[in-house]
Amino acid sequence: TGEPVGFDVDLIAAVAKKMGLESSYLPNQKFDTLVPLIKQGGKADVAIAGITITDDRVKEVDFTEPYLDSNQAIVVKKDSGETEDSLNVADKKVACQSGTTGDDWISENLPAAERVPLDDVTAALTGVSTGLYSAMVIDLPVASYMLTQSFSDLEVAKEIPTGEQYGIAVSKDQPALTEALNKALADMESDGTMKDIKTKWFGSEI
């Protein structure tokens, strides 16, 4: 149908309902354009797309309270035997989504490997599946969903605890909106809506 689907889509729809609003979506945007888009204003009020709250991003935009913990995951072909150590060599290609914390993690922790930043998560995971890439470093919630839905031949070789969390990005010019979003998120936690959405998409309350 062309309509966006996913955990974040269900989440923002539920948030909008709590606020008495309707959500409308911009056409697909590259991940690394989202924070600049919100900062400049005019096109979108909020961005929700698995955006990790980081010091650099907080300088540009405001964030709601976190709505999901997000560690990183190293995803490999099942039974490949690949590990963090085995990937840190010159002939290994490790994919990531451009501009993400996974992108940064590869640079810092797998400096010998060839980092391959891509715009599309599905293309990156398909590359791991076909052997084009040895691994992908990706947010664990995204990996959990994608491996369950589409990539049963892949597995998480390692979970990387990062202490990272997702938040909804909001322009610094709209503090009242951030406050209203926080209230809606808190209501969803207390009435079970958040738990239901997490269980629907991840199979459990991750």
Residue ranges, per PLM feature:
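Extended ligand-binding regions for polar small-molecule ligands
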Residues: 9-18, 80, 93, 98-101, ...
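Short helix-initiation/N-cap motifs at beta->coil->alpha
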Residues: 9, 24-37, 81-82, 98, ...
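Alpha-to-beta junction loops
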Residues: 20-22, 40-49, 92-93, 111, ...
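Short loop->beta-strand "edge-of-pocket" segments that line small-molecule binding or catalytic clefts
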Residues: 5, 86-100, 114
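Beta->alpha turn/N-cap motifs
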Residues: 27-31, 42-54, 77-78, 99-100, ...
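Periplasmic-binding protein-like
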Residues: 68-76, 140, 144-186, 204-206
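Extracytoplasmic small-molecule ligand-binding "clamshell" domains
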Residues: 1-50
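Flexible hinge/capping segments at coil-to-helix
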Residues: 64-67, 76-94
